[in-house]
Amino acid sequence: QVNFTPSW
């Protein structure tokens, strides 16, 4: 499971 959280 891959979680990507952008900081913008």
From Swiss-Prot:
GO terms for molecular function: hormone activity. It comes from Striatophasma naukluftense. The lineage of its organism: Eukaryota, Metazoa, Ecdysozoa, Arthropoda, Hexapoda. Transmembrane segments: none annotated. This hormone, released from cells in the corpora cardiaca, causes release of diglycerides from the fat body and stimulation of muscles to use these diglycerides as an energy source during energy-demanding processes. The modification Tryptophan amide is found at W8. GO terms for biological process: flight behavior; neuropeptide signaling pathway. Belongs to the AKH/HRTH/RPCH family. This is Adipokinetic hormone. It is found in: Secreted.
